[in-house]
Regions:
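Catalytic P-loop NTPase motifs of RecA-like helicase/translocase cores
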Residues: 72-74, 220, 257, 284-286, ...
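Conserved C-terminal RecA-like helicase domain
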Residues: 248, 376-473
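Conserved RecA-like P-loop NTPase helicase motor core
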Residues: 72, 256, 446-550, 554
Length: 622
């Protein structure tokens, strides 16, 4: 009997004896989207992963995997495959069957046993075993871990990793833990995950009042109008010092609770007012021992506190893990790319001569503003923070424009700069390189920084996939985190990564990792002018690029595509530690020189792919 008949005639009846076909049994269950593979201009997807049977105790609470084989196979022939799926899906029981019996692997005990076809466990039996092993038998715990998910006909359903994050969070709370850390890569739906956690907890007697903390208005507004929209009737945004107790879900900027001069406004509210606090992008300071935001969390210490971030910060001064504890779940950038939920990327590295050899100034000369120049060689990390070389940022703008002309001039592009002045210089240089479009469409290129009201007013248009303009934006820090631009196809790195380089690097890479197939966005390209891609070799980084390309002067800047015979592996370069970065926008901290007349050009080209063993394989050299 073949596998289809075995399932239909033998395995299905055995399972359906005690499991509901419509709500608990899911056959041919696909749980990944298939990794996106990019080779030159060719884009394909690998096969999706699927389980023969996924069994759920309740919607969103998977409990068992069953892999089926035909009657010619042994009863345990599918067990290891099922175990692999169960581990990935965080499921406690895996089964294999050939229609003549079942073999069970219990991840809770590590033991295996064989079962007759009429001995397949019922949902209540598996749930009881699971609850006992996890210490969730108490009625209080059961109320929390079985609270229903929000389900809307035609709406979003949690992906497998979101279910894991949600279920592990509720289980931790059910066991009495009140500080919880979730680490999920940018673009994997942290706010949707947070919404489901809030919704489920609000179905219990444990949680009524919820505070959602963020550090930017755009993040708050996106969340209220997006994933949290089903709760809008009971939701309010904190304005000033007012906290209307008639609402149940409160969104607030950190700044609304802590004044500019350190006033502890939050103390006007009862310390037990909130039952649950969600800390969005918690790496951005809430865990610092001397942070004002830490004071907010410690004041409301009776509340359950959940920190969410793509990049937990661990330094001598700041530790998310010390405050929240080890993450209850981590879903990495690498895993998101492998599952096909995040976009892979190419890297193009134009090497500028001044970046390689430095820029020498002589004592006794002055810059464009009359400042006396020192005798020294300025290096790459000094450009645009210590010294501004007009020809350098103009060459960068020229290469960005060249790439867009060779690919698509209307690809949404973010250019990350050293500081606000650099962002303005880059905007002007890009305008001059693209005057043919800017003449008719002045918002084709915009600077969006914290000090620019006009630029920030265009942020919603940049994010909107149906709005063509702005197409290119220059920024320093404002767009580093949280801003959801699904159609961003180009990320330009002309900034610096200092003390917390890896955290910021991951956040910036995350600006492009969202997939938007309706707008032909399956991968994105990084133009790296600062050697930031050295961080790919850092052990902390977990999502390698699919290609690295270094163009020669005069050559097309777009990736030429596959070629050659594969070449040989080249070990990745060692990480380079930047010197401390001075605050770029504080004019009193240092003198910034401005010069022009330099000869700036691109000097090299290399195309490299990352192999499956993590080495760089050289495809071509020029």
């Amino acid at each position: 009997m073949n596998e289809s008949d075995t399932r239909l005639k033998l395995i299905d009846p055995a399972i359906m004896e005690s499991w509901d076909r419509n709500t608990q049994v899911f056959t041919e269950y696909f749980f990944t989207s298939g990794e996106i593979v990019v080779r030159g201009s060719m884009v394909t997807r690998k096969d999706k992963k699927k389980a023969d049977y996924l069994l759920m105790y309740a919607p969103g609470i998977p409990i068992a995997i069953v892999e089926a084989k035909d009657t010619e196979h042994t009863v345990d022939a599918g067990l290891q495959q099922g175990m692999g799926y169960a581990q990935l899906l965080d499921i406690p029981f895996a089964y294999s069957s050939n229609g003549k019996g079942f073999v069970e692997h219990d991840f809770l005990t590590g033991k295996e046993r064989t079962l007759a076809m009429d001995e397949f466990p019922a949902p209540a039996e598996l749930w009881t075993r699971y609850s006992k092993a996890k210490g969730l038998e108490h009625p209080y715990s059961q109320e929390i871990v079985t609270a229903p998910y929000y389900q809307e006909h035609g709406g979003n359903h949690p992906r497998y990793y979101q279910c894991i994050a949600i279920n592990r969070t509720l289980e931790a709370i059910a066991r009495g833990k009140n500080r919880i850390l979730l680490v999920m890569a940018t673009g994997t739906g942290k706010t949707f995950t947070a919404f489901q956690i809030v919704h489920r907890l609000r179905q219990t007697t444990e949680v009524r009042k919820v505070l959602y903390l963020a550090d930017r208005n755009i993040l708050v507004d996106q969340t209220i109008d997006g994933d949290f929209k089903p709760l809008k009737r009971v939701t309010t945004k904190v304005v000033g010092r007012k906290l209307d107790s008639a609402y149940e879900v409160y969104f607030s900027l950190y700044q609304q609770l802590v004044g500019e001069n350190g006033e502890e406004i939050f103390r006007e509210f009862d310390s037990e007012f909130f039952d649950l606090i969600i800390v969005d992008e918690c790496h951005r300071g809430s865990a610092a021992a001397d942070s004002a935001w830490r004071k907010v969390l410690e004041y409301f210490n009776c509340a359950i506190q959940i920190g969410m971030t793509a990049t937990p910060k661990e330094t001598e001064e700041v530790s998310n893990i010390t405050y929240f504890g080890e993450p209850v779940y981590t879903y990495s950038l690498k895993q998101g790319i492998e599952d096909g939920f995040l976009a892979p990327y190419k890297v193009i590295r134009p090497k500028l001569n001044v970046d390689i050899y430095g820029y020498r100034t002589e004592e006794g000369t002055v810059d464009d503003r009359g400042e006396a120049l020192p005798k020294r060689v300025f290096e790459k990390q000094d450009f645009d923070s210590e010294i501004v070389i007009k020809e350098r940022y103009e060459e960068v703008a020229k290469r960005i424009t060249q790439f867009l002309k060779e690919t698509d001039r209307y690809s949404k592009t973010i250019v990350f700069c050293v500081d606000i002045e650099h962002a303005e210089n880059m905007r002007r240089a890009l305008v001059n390189e693209n005057a043919d479009i800017v003449r008719d469409h002045p918002t084709y290129i915009m600077k969006i920084t914290g000090d620019d009201r006009e630029g920030k007013a265009q942020l919603d248009n940049f994010i909107d996939p149906d709005e063509k303009y702005p197409t290119i934006v220059t920024t320093s820090k404002l767009l580093t985190t949280g801003v959801n631009c699904k159609t961003c196809k180009v990320v330009v790195l002309d900034n610096k990564f200092g003390e917390h380089g890896m955290t910021e690097f991951k956040q910036i890479i995350g600006r492009g990792t969202r997939i938007c197939e309706d707008y032909d966005k399956l991968y994105f390209t990084i133009l790296d002018f600062r050697d930031a891609s050295r961080l790919f070799a850092d052990p902390e980084f977990d999502g390698e690029p699919v290609v690295v390309f270094e163009p020669n002067p005069g050559d097309p800047i777009a990736d030429p595509g596959p070629g050659g015979n594969g070449g040989s592996p080249v070990p990745p370069p060692p990480p380079i530690v930047d010197p401390p970065v001075l605050p770029p926008d504080d004019p009193s901290s240092h003198v910034k020189y401005h010069v022009h007349g330099a000869d700036v050009y691109v000097v090299s080209e290399m195309v490299q792919y990352y192999s499956s063993d993590g080495l760089l394989v050289t495809e071509s050299l020029k």
